[in-house]
Amino acid sequence: MPELFDLEDLETNSALPTSGLIAITMDSAGVAHFAIPRAEVGQGITTAAAMIIAEELDLPLSQVDVSLAPARPELVFNQLTGGSNTMNSMFTPIRVAAAIARGALLQAAALELGVALSALTTRAGVISGPGGVSRTYGQLAAKAASATTRAVSVTLKNTSAFTLVGTPQNRVDALAAVTGQKKFTMDLVVPGALPTMVCRPPTLNGSPHGSSTSPRSG
């Protein structure tokens, strides 16, 4: 049977043109930050994205911070959340972004330590070289940073070498959720906004006859 081009494929393909615009940043404490341009609605995409980044960056999961990105017009359809498509369409782009970040850190380490790039290894957020020399990702973050967007080649980790992706992990937002610290849409406070209720007609194809701004009594 030939493969069918379905809604899942359509969503994935519509996100591809802007997938190269997502990026990962590293701070001086060695924490990787990523703002995912999709909606976390309980399906666990922030945890999944953090696991992918930690895997590709050779970084402990505890040192990855995934937040929800604000609306970015330039991302167009890369902000669509639906059809169980987020991880299908973002798995590789997130891996690529993490691999690019790792490559930049390795290049910075090679320059700072004065050793060949091929002589360096990464593990748990530390780059090590010959003779025991090493630098943490945090120490190299500023030197590895780039303010420009350019095409680069990247080699992804072989899936057979995965140690985190595919393993059971606690949700990164679980503690905040059960202790009342997690913010939901209902927690949003908009200055000057008034309570609103959606009114639906009791019949099919019903329509309102009028409206009033006068306060209701009773």
PLM segments and residue spans:
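Cofactor-binding beta-sheet edge motifs in enzyme active sites
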Residues: 1-218
